[in-house]
Design a protein with these regions (language model features):
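Alpha-helical residues within the helix-turn-helix
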Residues: 49, 60, 66-67
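Histidine-centered divalent metal-coordination motifs
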Residues: 15, 60-61
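N-terminal helix-turn-helix DNA-binding core of bacterial DNA-binding proteins
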Residues: 8, 14-54, 80-87
Length: 100
């Protein structure tokens, strides 16, 4: 984990919202093609619709979260799915307790 990258990724309200939505995706999204959103994740088109932004902006936000290690990706066919990396998020919490 690179704390600076994590905090940069978290410095945007929409990216924070994405992380919140991915915590309990069934509350915020309709399953895409029968995909288990907890196990596999949420498709970029679902995030795009929820953000009410362009797909390129949503993809950029997801990419930033992914590079920071906050989310994982899984490719199934032509779709990429995103879900939270709960282990990294726990590490961030521990880091904050110890370092700040």
């Amino acid at each position: 984990m690179k704390p600076i990258e994590v905090f940069k990724a978290l410095s945007n309200e929409s990216r924070l919202e994405i992380l919140q939505w991915l915590k309990e995706p069934e509350q915020y999204f309709t399953p895409h093609e029968g995909i288990d959103m907890r196990e596999i994740g949420v498709c970029v088109s679902q995030v795009t619709e929820k953000l009410n932004m362009t797909q390129s902006t949503a993809s950029q936000y997801l990419s930033i979260l992914h590079r920071a290690g906050l989310i994982k990706t899984e490719r199934l066919g032509k779709f990429t799915y995103y879900k939270r990396d709960e282990e990294v998020i726990r590490e961030i919490g521990e880091y904050l307790k110890q370092e700040i």
